[in-house]
A protein has these predicted regions:
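Non-catalytic signal-transmission and effector/linker regions of two-component phosphorelay proteins
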Residues: 1-2
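Helix N-cap/capping motif at the beta->alpha junctions
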Residues: 31-40
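Active-site residues of response regulator receiver
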Residues: 53
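Short acidic/histidine-rich motifs immediately flanking catalytic phosphotransfer sites
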Residues: 45-49
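Solvent-exposed polar/charged
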Residues: 22, 43-44
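Conserved acidic carboxylate
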Residues: 7
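Two-component/phosphorelay signaling modules centered on CheY-like receiver
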Residues: 10-30
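Receiver (REC) domain active-site loop signature in two-component systems and cognate sites
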Residues: 56
């Protein structure tokens, strides 16, 4: 499973990605620090699940 984590707080984003990568069915976790970066990543790297911060800079 491929995931995207979009979170503007880098420490929280890094920790969440590390935890997700420990799951055996997770093969890759993409990271985005803002909404624009998340959209750019999704245009070229399809994911199964996107985990998005509700209050994040565009």
């Amino acid at each position: 499973m491929r995931l995207l984590v979009a979170e503007d707080q880098s420490m929280l984003r890094d920790a969440l990605c590390q935890l997700l990568l420990l799951q055996e069915d997770v093969e890759d976790v993409l990271q985005a620090g803002d909404g624009q970066e998340a959209i750019r990543l999704l245009e070229t790297h399809p994911v199964d699940i996107a985990i998005l911060d509700i209050e994040m800079p565009i």
